[in-house]
Design a protein with these regions (language model features):
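Acidic, glycine-rich flexible loop/linker segments
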Residues: 2-153, 157-174
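Conserved alpha/beta-domain cores
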Residues: 117-442
Length: 442
């Protein structure tokens, strides 16, 4: 064994290693290789989708590499500590995520067995089993997996790969320096209207996901880049502040109504309107991330209405992510303005326990199964039910820990949204849990 870290998913892969020291060298990567690096961020996504597997020195189960690899359905091992020193480019290795919580990297090509499952006769549980989706190019393939819709459609992949340009670099194109205008021109070639480029590309990406799962509900999370991630988009560094802690900074709901970004958010709204009204995909619903207070939530809804996308129009439901302790403590107030909640267990665990989810040093303390996190989820479910609001979960916890999924089902959660690679095994588990519960009641 060459290295060990946290397993992401439950698959296994073999291939040749490509050690990439930083994002400036991603052009060296070849499809089918095993990507080895220190840590990833959205700038790496163009090559991640072509990797046989991903291994990083740093990061936890909710790091960027972990989240993206789950959505892509490829194995990943994060937080190995020294993988960039333990292997060399061109070396053949086996990446195993099928041995429990620990992921292991072995030298050479090991033999393994593939188990297949016939899903044609699989029953549907009472709890809705939804899916986390981010890459439109994978949407139709993933839609073939038995599901009840998309509980989390991530917009960030479309931003980074289909749009690539910061929204304000398009709305304020004429104020940009000549060299930045040239970069924007290169990306937007074929579009005379820079704003139309953004709306069209974003609508195409969102619409592809909504179409793949139609008529099942697709809950789209509004953009949730942090400032350092927005800054990596073309022209982005001219519009984003440098923050000491972007994870807790200007992100999510706080951006949408702010005078420094409202015009950028308006473009998102235009794209959503196009998908719902022009494409006719009214199964597309909306979710507001990182909403700190009910007052902030109302401000976001007001901006959406001003831009022609009011809640309830043509059946539009608007959900809020429950990922901040205030979302739990003030759930009754949030219930007055939103149609439901989706628990973001990644950030909720981080903020309830005070643990940096991306730090390898405290990775052992980041545990969604902690009683404080479980109690927060249980309290939210009860409050949501009291006010007649739907509540689901779209964080990593149910995908990683079957016992956490079982806990949520017993608490009466309405839906569980999973990474594609966890849908079938978790569906089987939930069917068993519900069957046992019905037997006891009988």
């Amino acid at each position: 064994m060459l290295a060990e870290g946290l397993a992401v998913g439950d698959k296994i892969a073999t291939g040749k290693v490509r050690v990439i020291p930083n994002v400036s060298h991603i052009r060296d990567f070849r499809p089918g290789e095993i990507l080895v690096t220190d840590i990833t961020d959205p700038d790496w996504e163009p090559i991640m989708k072509n990797a046989a597997a991903i291994i990083t020195n740093r990061g936890g189960r909710t790091s960027h590499a972990a989240i993206v690899s789950r959505e892509l359905g490829i194995p990943a091992i994060v937080g190995t500590g020294n993988i960039t020193r333990a292997v060399k480019t061109g070396q053949t290795v086996t990446v195993s995520c099928c041995e429990g919580e620990a992921g292991r990297v072995y030298d050479g090509e090991l033999k393994y067995r593939v188990d297949k499952m016939d899903v044609s006769a699989m029953a549907r549980p009472h709890t809705k089993i939804m899916m986390n989706v981010g890459n439109p190019e994978m949407a139709f393939k993933q839609a073939a997996i038995p599901n009840d819709g998309v509980g989390l459609a991530r917009m960030e992949f479309i931003f980074a790969n289909w749009v690539q340009v910061h929204p304000l670099a398009l709305t304020r194109y004429h104020s940009l320096p000549a060299e930045v205008q040239q970069q924007v021109d290169a990306v937007t070639a074929g579009y005379s209207d820079k704003v139309e480029f953004f709306v069209d590309k974003l609508a195409q990406g969102i619409g592809t996901i909504a179409a793949a799962f139609y008529p099942k509900p697709v809950i789209l999370r509004l953009s949730d880049f942090k400032t350092n991630e927005y800054a990596h988009l073309v022209g982005g560094n001219r519009f984003e502040p440098e923050e000491a802690n972007p994870m807790l900074g200007w992100r999510g709901a706080s951006r949408y109504y702010h005078p420094d970004y409202r015009e950028g958010f308006a473009l998102e709204v235009k794209a959503i309107k196009r998908v719902r009204e022009e494409y006719g995909l009214t199964n597309l619903l909306v979710m507001v991330p990182f909403c700190r207070t009910p007052e902030e939530g109302q401000q976001v809804l007001d901006v959406m209405a001003e831009e022609g996308l009011p809640r309830s129009k043509d059946g539009l439901e608007v959900y809020v992510m429950a990922e901040i302790p205030s979302n739990i403590l003030l759930a009754a107030d949030f219930s007055q303005i939103f149609d439901g909640f989706s628990i973001g267990s990644n950030d909720l665990t981080q903020l309830v326990l005070g643990v940096d989810r991306d730090s390898s040093q405290v990775a052992s303390l980041f545990d969604e199964r902690n009683q404080a996190v479980r109690q927060s989820c249980a309290d939210l479910i009860r409050t949501a039910q009291q006010y007649g609001r739907k509540v689901g979960i779209c964080g990593q916890a149910p995908s990683d820990y079957p016992e956490f999924a079982a806990f949520l089902v017993k608490e009466g959660i309405d839906s569980i949204s999973l990474n594609p690679d966890a849908v079938l095994r978790t569906t089987k588990l939930i069917l068993e849990i519900e069957e046992k519960a019905e037997t006891v009641l009988a």
